[in-house]
Curated annotation (Swiss-Prot):
GO terms for molecular function: undecaprenyl-diphosphatase activity. GO terms for biological process: cell wall organization; peptidoglycan biosynthetic process; regulation of cell shape; response to antibiotic. Coiled coil: none annotated. This is Undecaprenyl-diphosphatase. Its main location: membrane. The keyword Transmembrane helix applies. The gene is uppP. It holds the Pfam family BacA. It comes from Streptococcus mutans serotype c (strain ATCC 700610 / UA159). It is an enzyme of class 3 (hydrolase).
Length: 281
């Protein structure tokens, strides 16, 4: 029944809206959810496309929240403010290039070799440990970059190199870029905010690639599948509006140690579940 499919789409949208922005891997959570919730008559092509395209809802929340800052054509902006906005976009595009190029070349290969329980679990655990280590190492260390406007182009580019690591499922795009930002001397606030903006070209691009591959495969998107996709995107958008604001406030007074511990716990859970599947089917 369509009603139950809508409920499933809502669940996926909630999971995506929460996990896309927190550094805990949306892929890891979606893989776990997919083990228990399946769309009726959904083939692998639709599922693969669905898991990426619902990110559009999440990224639209960033555009809505930060529209004034991201819009260089907003009336009332001074010449300096317009310049700052264009510089921000230049840094975002520069930072997005490495992941865009590597992703286009190796997308299918990465999905084929790393889209599984054990790879995702390993990445969850490794980066969980990394977060805890980096936060302890940086206790009492004053960040060099405390405002996004002063983020150097070189630092933005190197944050983009960290984003390449997130092409391996389970890493977390936000996790990789936030971790990279902290290691490169930015404050948690700057790293988090730049991560939001960096998601715009990357997630729009990734969604476009998946849609094109879906079309090229010759698979037909049914009306009910399109409706389910739109529902999930809308829910992801609504949830993201809250999560983005939550994380922005959270990092003002907290570090990412909790998320590191959470990642380790989830990774162990996925490893155990994956092992049980191998042993008992």
């Amino acid at each position: 029944m369509l009603f139950f499919e809508i409920i499933k789409a809502i669940i996926f949208g909630i999971v995506e809206g929460i996990t896309e922005w927190l550094p805990i891997s949306s892929t890891g959570h979606l893989i776990l959810v997919e083990e228990f919730i399946h769309f009726n008559n959904a083939n692998a092509a639709f599922t693969n496309m669905f898991n990426v395209v619902i990110q559009l809802g999440a990224i639209l929340a960033v555009v809505v929240i930060y529209f004034d800052r991201l819009n260089p054509f907003k009336s009332g902006k001074t010449a300096r403010e317009v310049q700052i906005t264009w510089q921000l976009w230049a840094k975002v595009i520069l930072s997005a290039l490495p992941a865009a190029v590597i992703g286009l070349i190796f997308d299918d290969w990465l999905d084929a070799h790393f889209q599984n329980f054990f790879s995702v679990a390993l990445m969850l655990i490794l980066y969980g440990i990394a977060f805890i280590y980096v936060e302890r190492r940086h206790q009492g260390v004053e960040p060099q970059v405390t405002h996004l406007v002063s983020l150097p182009y070189k630092t933005a580019f190197f944050i983009g190199l960290f984003q390449v690591l997130s092409l391996i499922p389970g890493t977390s795009r936000s996790g990789a870029t936030i971790l990279g930002g902290i290691l490169l001397g930015t404050s948690r606030q700057v790293a988090t905010e730049f991560t939001f903006f960096l998601g715009i070209p990357i997630m729009f691009g990734a969604s476009l690639v998946k849609v094109l591959k879906f079309i090229v495969s010759g698979t037909i998107l049914t009306g009910s599948q399109l409706f389910i996709l739109l529902v999930a995107m809308l829910v992801a958008f609504a949830v993201s509006l809250y999560v983005i604001r939550f994380l922005t406030d959270y990092v003002k007074n907290h570090d990412f140690t909790f998320f590191g511990k959470y990642r380790i716990g989830l990774g162990i859970l996925l490893l155990f579940y994956g092992l049980m599947k191998v042993l008992f089917g």
